[in-house]
């Protein structure tokens, strides 16, 4: 069923069941992925997915229900799911259903260049990366490379007048090389992404992957102690990603939470 028609019928059924206001969030996505390993096309995947979540207020509580089938048969199941889940809610801390704001900031993260790419172009890029991964250095062995694209349309509507939709897409490529020297072995995994073929240079990606894997061959263990260090930007990014939850005000407010890494009173501004 066409999405707007489905949501319209869903809201009518929700109103008849005493669910007001009601809100529907829907994600529709397409993805493509090809993987090449040492000259051979190893994997090829094309998929389409859709998912819709209905939220609605019932007796002061907001219930939710989800489906992946936008069919007439799904509507009563969603309504029943919202009614049942709302009856189980015990907390007053819920994200409310709100009317639309006067305006919204524009975010552009899609490109016609990605949509226009053919499967043949993506496969050709993957094969080119695989070719560039090969090296005269006997220590280096190409492993795998992949090229993928993804597109998503996200729609958010409610019975208070909100009606928003956003389309996004991207292309990304990854390469993996194994380096061996005697008993030492290392691997490197590099990725690039953007909004068109011009964002991914096969040679640059492959050379970076080979260079980084060779650098890791020199790594070794160190005795415990205090050392001056220089941290690579990508390593610092991984470190911050691991511990970012420690700095979450939301997590602190939900307490009691004990963070051994960060002990601050919740009233102190930092």
Segment roles from a protein language model:
Residues 1-262:
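Active-site bordering "gate/hinge" segments
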Residues 261-270:
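Single conserved hydrophobic/aromatic residue that forms the stacking wall/gate
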């Amino acid at each position: 069923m066409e999405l707007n028609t489905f949501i319209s019928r869903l809201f009518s059924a929700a109103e008849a069941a005493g669910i007001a206001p009601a809100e529907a969030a829907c994600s529709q996505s397409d993805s493509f992925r090809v993987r090449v390993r040492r000259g051979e096309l190893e994997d090829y995947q094309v998929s389409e997915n859709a998912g819709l979540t209905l939220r609605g207020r019932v007796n002061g509580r907001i219930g939710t229900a989800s489906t992946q089938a936008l069919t007439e048969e799904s509507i009563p199941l969603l309504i029943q799911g919202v009614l049942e889940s709302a009856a189980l809610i015990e907390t007053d801390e819920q994200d409310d259903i709100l009317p639309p704001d006067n305006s919204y900031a524009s975010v552009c993260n899609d490109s016609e260049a990605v949509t226009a790419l053919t499967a043949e172009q993506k496969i050709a890029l993957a094969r080119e990366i695989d070719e560039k991964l090969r090296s005269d250095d006997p220590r280096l062995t190409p492993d795998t490379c992949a090229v993928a694209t993804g597109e998503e349309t996200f729609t958010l509507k409610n019975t208070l007048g909100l009606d928003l939709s956003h389309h996004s897409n991207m292309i990304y490529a990854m390469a993996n090389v194994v380096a061996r020297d005697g008993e030492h072995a290392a691997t490197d995994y590099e990725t690039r992404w953007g909004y068109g073929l011009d964002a991914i240079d096969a040679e640059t990606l492959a050379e970076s992957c080979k260079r980084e894997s060779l650098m890791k061959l020199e790594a070794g263990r160190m005795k415990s102690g205090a050392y001056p260090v220089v941290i690579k930007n990508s390593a610092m990014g991984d470190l911050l990603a691991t511990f970012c939850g420690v700095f979450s005000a939301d997590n602190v407010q939900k307490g009691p939470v004990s963070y051994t890494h960060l002990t601050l009173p919740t009233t102190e501004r930092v």
